[in-house]
């Protein structure tokens, strides 16, 4: 099962450097805190619509593979993050199987809990980078995050209803 927003997310093309953009746009794209929290600050009720979740092999993550350790399996989670029921963001998280140990096993059990609610309560969360991407007029971003030093890759596409636009 897929969704057109996830297809467009995978089509994002990333800038080699952070482009010169309007400050309001950069404020959204370079946000280091939780996007869930930012959406809630807009006075919205945030919910997750699950598109896909489960283990995948390398051939299903060609865009992410160069940015993660080479392993036999990865945990993939694809969602729509909705504000008052309206999709504002498509998200794709790829987690190497080696990251799924200790407390990080919880990444497999998030269900309809927004990823940000888990990640940004962890004292061990660090971010290696944020890349800005664009496709067909929509903006997105990709971050390699680490929990207790263990990597995961999060890609987000801001959908047309998002306040980023």
From Swiss-Prot:
Q: Which Pfam families match?
A: Chor_lyase
EC number assigned by the record: 4.1.3.40
GO MF annotation: an example? chorismate lyase activity
Keywords attached to this entry: Cytoplasm, Lyase, Pyruvate, Ubiquinone biosynthesis
Keyword hit for Nucleus: no
In terms of InterPro entries, this protein maps to: Chorismate--pyruvate_lyase, Chorismate_lyase_/UTRA_dom_sf
Pathway named in the protein's UniProt entry: Cofactor biosynthesis; ubiquinone biosynthesis
Which PANTHER family does the record cross-reference, listed alphabetically? CHORISMATE PYRUVATE-LYASE
Member of which family?
Belongs to the UbiC family.
| Name recorded for this polypeptide | Chorismate pyruvate-lyase
The protein's organism comes out as Escherichia coli (strain 55989 / EAEC)
């Amino acid at each position: 099962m897929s969704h057109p927003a996830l297809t467009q997310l995978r089509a994002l093309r990333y800038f080699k450097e952070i482009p010169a953009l309007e400050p309001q746009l950069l404020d959204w794209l370079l946000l280091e805190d939780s996007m869930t929290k930012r959406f809630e600050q807009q006075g919205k009720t945030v919910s997750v619509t699950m598109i896909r979740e489960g283990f995948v092999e390398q051939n299903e993550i060609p865009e992410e593979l160069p940015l993660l350790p080479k392993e036999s399996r990865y945990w993939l989670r694809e969602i729509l993050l909705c504000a008052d029921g309206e999709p504002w963001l498509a998200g794709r998280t790829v987690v190497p199987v080696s990251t799924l140990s200790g407390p990080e096993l919880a990444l497999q059990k998030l269900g309809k809990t927004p990823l940000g609610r888990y990640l940004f309560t962890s004292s061990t969360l660090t971010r290696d980078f944020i890349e800005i991407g664009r496709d067909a007029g929509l903006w997105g971003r990709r971050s390699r995050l680490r929990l207790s030093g263990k990597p995961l890759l999060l890609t987000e596409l801001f959908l047309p209803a998002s306040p980023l636009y």
